[in-house]
Curated annotation (Swiss-Prot):
<keyword id="KW-0106">Calcium</keyword>
<protein>
    <recommendedName>
        <fullName>C-type lectin 37Da</fullName>
    </recommendedName>
</protein>
<keyword id="KW-0964">Secreted</keyword>
<dbReference type="InterPro" id="IPR050111">
    <property type="entry name" value="C-type_lectin/snaclec_domain"/>
</dbReference>
<feature type="disulfide bond">
    <location>
        <begin position="140"/>
        <end position="160"/>
    </location>
</feature>
<keyword id="KW-0325">Glycoprotein</keyword>
<dbReference type="GO" id="GO:0035006">
    <property type="term" value="P:melanization defense response"/>
</dbReference>
<keyword id="KW-0348">Hemagglutinin</keyword>
<dbReference type="Pfam" id="PF00059">
    <property type="entry name" value="Lectin_C"/>
</dbReference>
<dbReference type="GO" id="GO:0030246">
    <property type="term" value="F:carbohydrate binding"/>
</dbReference>
<keyword id="KW-0430">Lectin</keyword>
<feature type="signal peptide">
    <location>
        <begin position="1"/>
        <end position="20"/>
    </location>
</feature>
<feature type="glycosylation site" description="N-linked (GlcNAc...) asparagine">
    <location>
        <position position="47"/>
    </location>
</feature>
<dbReference type="GO" id="GO:0038187">
    <property type="term" value="F:pattern recognition receptor activity"/>
</dbReference>
<dbReference type="InterPro" id="IPR001304">
    <property type="entry name" value="C-type_lectin-like"/>
</dbReference>
<dbReference type="GO" id="GO:0046872">
    <property type="term" value="F:metal ion binding"/>
</dbReference>
<dbReference type="InterPro" id="IPR016186">
    <property type="entry name" value="C-type_lectin-like/link_sf"/>
</dbReference>
């Protein structure tokens, strides 16, 4: 998509008076291969991704909206390593709060997907006997120390809306960085 937009811009700009180029090429690389300084405030880099840890306790929908305002998404744990890195970061800060993720089964009860990328939730970090859709109303996934005896962060399903026991902090994940190079021959 980004490459198409850049190419479209160059084509349109090529018709502007005094801005005609004979030849150009674009190249898009994942990440920041030249370690350019990029201000990612308020995001925090953990491994190769950037996150914001929302401090207000809100329902899942408000958490999603807050992340979108930052042009990011609720966190999606694509690997167990990513989950473990976030859990380690929170533990290092002494933060045992519960946090919303993008996971839910709003589309089909019992089948949990990451809302951000439409992939099945496959990581094995559920709390014991979870997800359970207690009362037929738990559809959004959060992470936290789920039970009083829990010794680590785990996943659990909770009601998405303003249920008194379902107002949590949230974690936003920035989109993956891409570096766009444009070479123009005049």
């Amino acid at each position: 998509m980004l490459k198409t937009l850049v190419q479209l811009f160059l084509v349109v700009a090529g018709f502007a008076p005094g801005f005609g180029y004979d030849k150009y090429t674009t190249h898009i690389q994942n990440g920041n291969p030249y370690n350019l300084t990029v201000d990612m405030t308020p995001f925090i880099k953990i491994n190769e991704s950037y996150y914001v840890f929302g401090q207000t306790k809100v329902n899942w929908y408000v958490a999603y909206e807050n992340c979108r305002r930052l042009q990011s998404e609720l966190v999606t744990f694509e690997t167990a390593e990513e989950f473990d890195a976030i859990a380690a970061f929170l533990n290092a800060r002494g933060d045992r709060s519960e946090h919303w993720t993008s996971g839910n089964d709003l589309g089909k009860t019992g089948t949990h997907y990451w809302f951000s990328n439409a992939q099945l939730v496959t990581i094995k970090r559920w709390a014991p006997k979870q997800p359970d859709n207690a009362g037929g109303r738990e559809h959004c996934i959060h992470l936290g120390y789920i039970y009083g005896y829990s010794t680590e962060f785990q996943l659990n399903d909770r009601p998405c809306h303003n249920h008194a026991s379902s107002l949590f902090k949230y974690i936003c994940e920035a989109p993956k960085q891409e570096t766009v190079s444009i070479v123009v021959w005049k």
